[in-house]
Amino acid sequence: MYGNPSIIMGRKKLGDDGMKEQTCCFTGHRTIPTDKMQEIIGKTEAKVRELISEGYRCFIVGGAVGYDTIAAELLFRLRDGEHLDIRVILAYPFDGYTGPWSEEQKATYARLLPLYDERICVAAAASRGAYLARDRYIVDASSACIAYCTRQTGGTAYTIRYAAKKGMPVCNIAEDF
């Protein structure tokens, strides 16, 4: 259905393909309040549709549970519906990073994995630094970021600060709650 997505080890730079100006990354918390889930999905979809109307065609997710999974599922739905021309890319920190996840989370990941147009492994070995390298990688390959961030600490906050330092516009949909 989607062909064989390329699996790339190491530091391939997505921006090298001339798509950076049409690429958006996602960052967000692993835990999402269930009472706000539909509103979060709706606000994310509205922003994605806005970016598509502006010419964005490539979307990068980090492959974590929570907001990354919400974004991926939304993007696949849009791509399989009216926006056949968008690409959905997974940039993950290292092989085996899903080890500590629950069986349900692993099953969701396994269901989504073949749907990505491209899969990029950022680091060769497991480390805390690999997660931060993945976060920098997705920002460096993008020109916009959609986030769900309610805290000033952690990986999501780090990614937003890194994007801001690079001058990238960040839409934090959590600011509306």
Task: Annotate each PLM feature.
Residues 2-18:
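Short, Lys/Arg-enriched N-terminal segments with co-localized hydrophobic residues
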